Amino acid sequence: MAQNQPSSAIAVIPSDTINIPVPGIITSGTNTSGVATTLTDAGQDFRNSATNPNGYNISGGDVVISAAGVICEIASVDSATQLTLLAPGIAAGAYDIYKGNYQIQGESEGFTLFVGTGGPATVLRIQTLEGQDVSLLNVPDSSFIPIQVQRGWAATTTCSNILALQ
């Protein structure tokens, strides 16, 4: 179960396919590729031989979030300066990479959500740690959600300014 006093947080970008990533940027940079599903950054070395001494590795399943707020998953590390991304990919520009949250159901602590903007007729659709699809209705502004979550769905979610606390 999540702690009552979280020590980390990440802004939730609702996605129907990607779990909320692990809080904490592992690296960031500027994508110069003109192809949405290719991330190219001459200032990076994505290979494990370079990243492992820094305390992390980048691999398929990790998550890229663009400065525009688009979330996508890394499919593979192709070279020192290039990653292949799963659709939708991202446009050229600034990005952050986070560790993916590929959870085994029931074996992770998950997230407590804080909903900044809700209100009457709002919907927050979530996936619980056990994989259940739950829609919460009429979620008030500035609300904590009392269920452990691994994903915030894009489909039908109308709440915004959501934080995942861990």
Would you name each region that the model predicts?
Residues 22-94:
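Autoprocessing Asn-cyclization modules and mimics
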